[in-house]
Amino acid sequence: MAEQVLPQALYLSNMRKAVKIRERTPEDIFKPTNGIIHHFKTMHRYTLEMFRTCQFCPQFREIIHKALIDRNIQATLESQKKLNWCREVRKLVALKTNGDGNCLMHATSQYMWGVQDTDLVLRKALFSTLKETDTRNFKFRWQLESLKSQEFVETGLCYDTRNWNDEWDNLIKMASTDTPMARSGLQYNSLEEIHIFVLCNILRRPIIVISDKMLRSLESGSNFAPLKVGGIYLPLHWPAQECYRYPIVLGYDSHHFVPLVTLKDSGPEIRAVPLVNRDRGRFEDLKVHFLTDPENEMKEKLLKEYLMVIEIPVQGWDHGTTHLINAAKLDEANLPKEINLVDDYFELVQHEYKKWQENSEQGRREGHAQNPMEPSVPQLSLMDVKCETPNCPFFMSVNTQPLCHECSERRQKNQNKLPKLNSKPGPEGLPGMALGASRGEAYEPLAWNPEESTGGPHSAPPTAPSPFLFSETTAMKCRSPGCPFTLNVQHNGFCERCHNARQLHASHAPDHTRHLDPGKCQACLQDVTRTFNGICSTCFKRTTAEASSSLSTSLPPSCHQRSKSDPSRLVRSPSPHSCHRAGNDAPAGCLSQAARTPGDRTGTSKCRKAGCVYFGTPENKGFCTLCFIEYRENKHFAAASGKVSPTASRFQNTIPCLGRECGTLGSTMFEGYCQKCFIEAQNQRFHEAKRTEEQLRSSQRRDVPRTTQSTSRPKCARASCKNILACRSEELCMECQHPNQRMGPGAHRGEPAPEDPPKQRCRAPACDHFGNAKCNGYCNECFQFKQMYG
């Protein structure tokens, strides 16, 4: 099987290329004799980019993920909102690295070249730099960073010159490759923050480490100790013009480094990584490590010099707010063909996938021979349109539109069960593979449930990427007009802000607003990505075709468009084109599809639903079983709403541009605008976001004098009392000075005492627990940690 054949690393797909990379890497290192730091000449500019896997079926995609991706670190960083929290930028995936103590070098090497540092080229370069070159600047920055750390600030630790030298010598020994007695039983000693800083100077390329800020307890998940690894490392020993400005992005969790690489994709997301963390209702800048005091004052300038910093709009925590955050642009794949291992691995994956398909097809045929009544859905061309089942992340195909294969199979299974209720045998009891237009809309699609998706290998890939990692690599913008944010598949095509606004509006709106839902087509009542005057693009094409040509009335309706003779409209408004007559009385245009269907019976009545290939029964008022259920639902809905939707929606002047005072035609590519108005709308959104940011800053400045003025008035000294003192010379207010008067004459000792003072947070930074007076203001866990480690 492919699960055994698929290599567990990229370099195993082509050993010759891997050897060529390992030969070129040490030759590219330049070691000056004048004390300048060792560095790479050209190979530090290469970047790896992973191939897309959404074209494979979920079962085979799972095999690829198991082979290459570190899903534990991926899931941990995403759950902590440190990785892939911003939908405006591309997703990053974590590749596996060896956990032998040299994972920092393995991850860095794999990010650039696709091979791990098994030859210790990067580690030897790090050790030789610390041992042979002038490291006084590195040591000075390390001492400054250590003095600002929590261990020195809170404990009052003080080092003399001998202590500093011993610690620095220990850091140099940790970078050595000759460590038979490494700590924690690893082959090599683990590296620290200063080693990352030296490495980025050797590479002349920034390094961004994404990690949590706290080391958390494995048992309770509570904060245990602060983590300082995450942040930005700039090659400050080099001028910015001599450095490569696209950063290396690494992930860190559980003392392990992994490379975080982008995916080859043509979606609208920006190839960048945010330079902020989203935490507790605010955006916090990533820490820039090993800055001197003068450099810390010009941090923003340094970031723009060493990185390609751009501003991107993101949704704020409050509804309707937009913030501009800084992000660093990432490099695209630029490895030469002779050393590009991703292409070879992708070719190998495609080869194994063909073999896997053949084996799966053979097994499916054997299973189908044993159970011939089990239906199967053929795989045809995929469409770049989402399945219309709410919350379904898959894409529709030509033969199953407007549904994906998973939802289509589930609906067919439901159809196979329903005809059993009807005792009369007929064609409606047989499962149909290719359904007609009206037949395809017998049901509104149910909400998608991943647990109900069909199991077992399919003969061909499904219509969508997996919800695990790659479900939004082809993500589109929110379907709300004028919204600049990226959609979320869990919110049925809307972004989080628009989804919350719709939920709030739906809770206050009456039930009759269902026909006015902007996300539904008023003609076919299907959930669509965008509507044109209330109808979807498929219905619009059909109505315009009918208006332009009289011959189009004889054509069968589109597979997405509801027929004009919807059963819910037969009683209210029978039109001359309605196809509610039975048998031979039906018009030829309505029976064109039924006439081509095999199994046509003479002497029995066709279903009253236009385009339905099955036969009706007198018990169901001339409908087949499925159409009769739809007829009852629509009739009940029409009676409840009190009004009938129009039989057809038409445009009078095609699609006008949404821009003000613009007479040109709009385009779906530009969200209903023409190209000129679309560019103006984008600029307006950008300036509005910038203006909102400035207003927030100005309001914060105005609030400062008010708070200082209010805090200048003295308050009562009792912790549970918030009254203002009438006289500055007293400490207690009048109520606290005369408690008996406040309690009243009927008070006695049995009444409850005043409320206790509010609990204070633990003194340890970033700790979520409450402090304890017996533990000197710390929580029990932090107090025990402080007692153990001083």
UniProtKB/Swiss-Prot annotation:
Zn(2+) 5 binds at C657, C662, C674, C677. Changing L227A: Strongly reduced 'Lys-48' deubiquitinase activity. Coiled coil: none annotated. Zn(2+) 2 binds at C478, C483, C495, C498. GO terms for biological process: apoptotic process; B-1 B cell homeostasis; cell migration; cellular response to hydrogen peroxide; cellular response to lipopolysaccharide; cytoskeleton organization; establishment of protein localization to vacuole; inflammatory response. Residues 369-775 are annotated as: Interaction with TNIP1. Residues 697-790 are annotated as: Required for lysosomal localization and for TRAF2 lysosomal degradation. Zn(2+) 4 binds at C607, C612, C624, C627. Residues 386-453 are annotated as: Interaction with RIPK1. InterPro entries: OTU_Deubiquitinase (IPR051346), OTU_dom (IPR003323), Znf_A20 (IPR002653). Residues 92-263 form the OTU domain. It catalyses: Thiol-dependent hydrolysis of ester, thioester, amide, peptide and isopeptide bonds formed by the C-terminal Gly of ubiquitin (a 76-residue protein attached to proteins as an intracellular targeting signal). Homodimer. Interacts with TNIP1, TAX1BP1 and TRAF2. Interacts with RNF11, ITCH and TAX1BP1 only after TNF stimulation; these interaction are transient and they are lost after 1 hour of stimulation with TNF. Interacts with YWHAZ and YWHAH. Interacts with IKBKG; the interaction is induced by TNF stimulation and by polyubiquitin. Interacts with RIPK1. Interacts with UBE2N; the interaction requires TAX1BP1. Interacts with TRAF6; the interaction is inhibited by HTLV-1 protein Tax. It is linked to Autoinflammatory syndrome, familial, Behcet-like 1: An autosomal dominant, autoinflammatory disorder with early onset, characterized by ulceration of mucosal surfaces, particularly in the oral and genital areas. Additional variable features include skin rash, uveitis, and polyarthritis. The A20-type zinc fingers mediate the ubiquitin ligase activity. The A20-type zinc finger 4 selectively recognizes 'Lys-63'-linked polyubiquitin. The A20-type zinc finger 4-7 are sufficient to bind polyubiquitin. The OTU domain mediates the deubiquitinase activity. This is Tumor necrosis factor alpha-induced protein 3.
